[in-house]
């Protein structure tokens, strides 16, 4: 094992400790101060009011919550993106099954907006119309690409009530079928899926959802990770500035 791999595993162990401590403390607070915890959760939910507190709050600090948060935190250790830096040219798959890469969708100096997400992530779907309006308003100066990644809240994982019912993808065909559900929403831009190695999700630290703007192979804008910090309006501001 090389030094870089050893360092990665040491960081993973540290993250494991942090997440385990967070879950343990969260459970204790739920028992000792249930009303105060609920107040805090309700305040967080105001950022995404379309999804009811009762649909997701009871799942906080569950075993499924622990494993999902750990996976997200571990993936973020592999983040290879920074504003101004070179954008990772990860392999992706078109809905037809054809393999390609992210850079294949860049056209000269036109900005390319990347939208990472999945159907089981409520904020991704609730803000889908906002994203479509971006395409309508800026298609003359920018290109757009949706990259469907692993499910945020699969029915056999950290599942929410009254959510889209999709299991974790066991193979590429499962992922392609899940991504095809987005076609019912008329996305108005190409839709591709991440490979089963989740390379784009890892290198762009995209789970559960995230927005980027690329230009000439570099990262012009790096949105914060969802669900609470997934903001299509920030992309609008970037594109308006470019267009002015």
Curated annotation (Swiss-Prot):
Pfam families found in the cross-reference section: T4_deiodinase (PF00837)
InterPro entries: Iodothyronine_deiodinase, Iodothyronine_deiodinase_AS, Iodothyronine_deiodinase_I/III, Thioredoxin-like_sf
PROSITE patterns tied to this protein: T4_DEIODINASE
GO cellular component, one term: endoplasmic reticulum membrane
Residues in the Cytoplasmic compartment per record: 34-244
Reactions accelerated catalytically: 3,3',5-triiodo-L-thyronine + iodide + A + H(+) = L-thyroxine + AH2; 3,3',5'-triiodo-L-thyronine + iodide + A + H(+) = L-thyroxine + AH2; 3,3'-diiodo-L-thyronine + iodide + A + H(+) = 3,3',5'-triiodo-L-thyronine + AH2; 3,3'-diiodo-L-thyronine + iodide + A + H(+) = 3,3',5-triiodo-L-thyronine + AH2
Active site: 121
Protein name: Type I iodothyronine deiodinase
Gene: DIO1
